[in-house]
Amino acid sequence: VAVLGTWLWRNLGKPEVPPLEPGLVTVAQTYHIDLEADPEGKLLRESITNASTGFATHDSKDARLAALIDKSLDMGRFDAACVAAVLLFDQHKREGKLMHIARSAAKDCATLPWGAFAAKGMKDPGVQTDAHFLLNARWRECPRP
């Protein structure tokens, strides 16, 4: 009874996360994060490394990483934004920034697969469910070649 009670406590109320559309997953699997591929990526990688290391507090590191995520998105560098987001220490900030990346990626069919990358990094089933619904709906609207 105790085992069943523990299982129910942990699993009831958690939404079942719908899968991403298979076509979106297939396209996302062709994307790779390689911040060493170009000078801009190298600078972003270096900035992310500097922001996430050292003797600063977690809040300070998270603030620097959050700023880099926003900067990366402004530059159209979803790869760097995803890398920086998963390094955030605060779970709520991480989930929020990953959802921000997913929403930003969903604005354009060409960047939509980066939203799948962001959703994969999410740990909160509720946030991940919202992201999957958004990404799947947007994927269905995108023209196919």
Language model region names:
Residues A2-P145:
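Non-catalytic tandem-repeat scaffold regions and their flanking low-complexity/translocation tails
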